[in-house]
Amino acid sequence: AFKDLKALGCKKAMNKFNKHTLLEYLLEEGNLSRPAVQLLGDVMSE
């Protein structure tokens, strides 16, 4: 995300991230598996 901010600038980076839900972002950009994302969600909701 920080690379995108530096490369695109604030406005373009925000537009990129507004298009994604957190789940979509973690799956596509973070290269995390669906079970890994679920585990993160479980931990964060505690």
From Swiss-Prot:
Major enzyme class: oxidoreductase
Expression induction: By interleukin-4.
Glycan attachment residues as annotated in the record: N31
Catalytic activity: an L-alpha-amino acid + O2 + H2O = a 2-oxocarboxylate + H2O2 + NH4(+); L-tryptophan + O2 + H2O = indole-3-pyruvate + H2O2 + NH4(+); L-phenylalanine + O2 + H2O = 3-phenylpyruvate + H2O2 + NH4(+); L-tyrosine + O2 + H2O = 3-(4-hydroxyphenyl)pyruvate + H2O2 + NH4(+)
Keyword Chaperone: no
Pathway: Amino-acid degradation; L-tryptophan degradation via pyruvate pathway
A Gene Ontology term for the protein's cellular component: sperm midpiece
Co-factor(s): FAD
Known EC number: 1.4.3.2, 1.4.3.25
Keywords of the record: Adaptive immunity, Cytoplasmic vesicle, FAD, Flavoprotein, Glycoprotein, Immunity, Lysosome, Oxidoreductase, Secreted
UniProt protein name: L-amino-acid oxidase
Organism: Mus spretus
